[in-house]
Swiss-Prot record:
Short-chain dehydrogenase; part of the gene cluster that mediates the biosynthesis of the yellow pigment chrysogine. the NRPS chyA mediates the condensation of anthranilic acid and alanine into the intermediate 2-(2-aminopropanamido)benzoic acid. The remainder of the pathway is highly branched yielding at least 13 chrysogine-related compounds. Belongs to the short-chain dehydrogenases/reductases (SDR) family. Pfam families: adh_short (PF00106). The active site is at Y154, K158. Gene3D superfamilies: NAD(P)-binding Rossmann-like Domain (3.40.50.720). It comes from Penicillium rubens (strain ATCC 28089 / DSM 1075 / NRRL 1951 / Wisconsin 54-1255). Its EC number is 1.1.1.-. InterPro entries: NAD(P)-bd_dom_sf, SDR_fam. This is Short-chain dehydrogenase chyC. GO terms for molecular function: oxidoreductase activity.
Length: 258
């Protein structure tokens, strides 16, 4: 029996993975961005051990989530599942748009502040292969709202979070750090035109959460059906990884543990 935290678990992959892990007798904590969403998900996954509430576009609330999770105890597995795909620029703390905040900065803050788990799973996307790899203006502070386009920004953010995951993997000894492309399915993010099966992605979540794989693997990219995928080669470049880490540290003032 494992203790598991899944961020962004009120719908989609996060919710379905939580349901299956609860059915498999694990102690699962959910996360919702608001109290209203928390009350709703309690009825969708009644076997969950609890629901933590935090808006991951806020540094203060992301810190609070880490503090409340740490108060529960060390987790066996943490799935950093929360993410944004579509939407307006919407400035958040430090002037960062909501999308790169939720997709990159929030996972960075949580990686820094949460007690180190046995397994840490970042949610990537095959769309990281469509990203710009020059890492200029990661958080849109120079380009601003006039140049913002949500789909390219999403692709870039998933490239950035994979670089972050690989940087964390090098630092967190004793933790299997992985990233996963869940698949293109008809969730809130995927939309109605999606072609993959949710179950194929969820079974990968469940495998990684339970540790039903070689946990000496770290810095590895998984895809649906429990398979290891081929990421963009640039995701393995240490200079790019450290550029993302430094950008996150410069914005937040929070240092990633060595």
């Amino acid at each position: 029996m494992a203790r598991i935290l899944i961020t962004g678990s009120t719908d989609g992959f996060g919710l379905e993975a939580a349901r299956q892990l609860v059915d498999r007798k694990h102690v699962v904590y959910l996360h919702a961005r608001s109290q209203e969403r928390a009350e709703e998900v309690k009825t969708k996954c009644p076997g969950a051990a609890g629901v933590l509430v935090a808006d991951l576009t806020s540094v203060a609330e992301t810190r609070k989530l880490a503090e409340e999770a740490n108060a529960i105890g060390t987790f066996d597995a943490i799935i950093l599942n929360a993410g944004l795909l579509y939407g307006p620029f919407r400035k958040t703390d430090y002037g960062v748009p909501a999308m790169p905040f939720v997709n990159v900065l929030a996972p960075y803050i949580l990686s820094c502040l949460l007690e180190q788990p046995k397994r840490l799973i970042f949610i990537a996307s095959i769309l990281h292969k469509e990203a710009k790899t020059d890492l200029k203006d990661i958080f849109w502070l120079e380009r601003g709202e006039k140049e913002f386009q949500d789909f390219p920004a999403y692709c870039d953010s998933k490239f950035h979070v994979m670089l972050l995951a690989n940087a964390v993997a090098k630092r967190f000894k004793g933790t299997s750090v992985t990233s996963v492309h869940p698949g293109y399915v008809a969730t809130k993010l995927g939309g109605s035109g999606a072609t993959d099966k949710m179950e194929d992605g969820v079974e990968t979540y469940v495998m990684l959460a339970e540790g039903d794989y070689d946990q000496s693997l770290t810095g590895v990219y998984f895809v649906p059906k429990k398979q290891i995928g081929e990421p963009l080669p640039e995701t393995t470049q240490e200079d790019l990884q450290e550029t993302v880490v430094k950008a996150c540290e410069d914005i937040t003032g929070i240092k990633l543990p060595a």
